[in-house]
Every structure is written in structure tokens, then in C-alpha cells.
Amino acid sequence: MSASNRPRIVRHVESGTTCCDPQWEAAYQRFETPEEEVRKFIHRLTRFGFPNLPKDSRIAEIFCGRGNGLVALERMGFTHLEGVDLSDDLLHQYRGTATLHLADCMDLPLTDGAYDVVVVQGGLHHLPTLPQDLDRCLECVMRILKPQGTFFVVEPWSTPFLTMVHLIVEQPWMRKIYAKGDALA
């Protein structure tokens, strides 16, 4: 791959710093292909009215993973995009024009009051300590949003599938087999 095809990643933490273990990242990548995820995100964003937003809206996606939400936004015509994730490996899979930040979403390195929209598509449930980490993350989101900005959140906490997964991984015998049950989610 040439240097021009590599994503632009601004590092705010050391490259070795990660939040996700390799088994979870592997499970995430097997769950659906990048193109399937992009199509899912386009459908979701369309359903929630993103086509009606100005195409020059400044949008940040936090917990962006491999950047497929950003690709969806690009395909929908948005041009001022930034993504934040703590996984260097996932960020390197992104193929688009957005600026990426290798950073902790509880300490967002983005400009105060600069974003029209902040998007989270399935990342908040990975915060290690609730509710403290959620509070810190939401404070950061409020700090970077413009006064009339929008925070768009999709979290899978109450889906039937995840309800079953959480019931299974909370079983003591499952914890003995695999202590990091989040990789199954």
C-alpha cells in the first residue's frame, strides 16, 4: 500500500496503548465485512435523517473502530469528518479521507465547540467502568459540540441478541472459560 492510501492518523497516545484485546478485535472483524457494515450504517443514518443535514456539517465519530461509519458518511456526501478510536490496528484499516485520532474517547483531543454532530455507533458499552467513564465521555462530547449541536448515539445494550449474550457471559462457568466475555458481544 502506498503512503497516499494510508489513513492520516494523529496520535494523542502511544501506538501500543489500546483498549481492546486482540480476541475482541478479531471477533468484531469477523462479525460483518466492512462493506456490510457500511451499508448498515448508511441505512441507519438515512433512517435518522442524516440526508437532511448540511453536507458541510462538521462531524466527529467517536469509537469509530475501522472507520466504516466515516465511510458511510463520506458516501452520503459529508466532507468534514474526523474519527477517534483507541485501537491503532482498527484505525489503520480505514480507507477514506477523514482525519483519524488515536486517542481515548474519555479525553477527546478535539476542538471545543467545533462540531455540529458527534456520532457513536456501538462504542459506549465498551467503556470499562460505568457510570464514571460514561460521565467522562459525555462531558467530552458536550465540550466539543457546538451549542446547538447534535449527539447521535446508537447502542446495542437492549437488543435481544445482546441480552442473551450478557446472560451467557455472566455465568460463572463461562467466566472461568473466558474471563473477557465482551469479545462475545
Segment roles from a protein language model:
Residues 106-118:
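A short acidic, Gly/Pro-enriched loop at the edge of an enzyme's catalytic core
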Residues 1-54, 56-65, 152-178:
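Conserved class I S-adenosyl-L-methionine
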Residues 125-130:
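A short His-aromatic
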Residues 66-107:
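Class I SAM-dependent methyltransferase SAM/SAH-binding core
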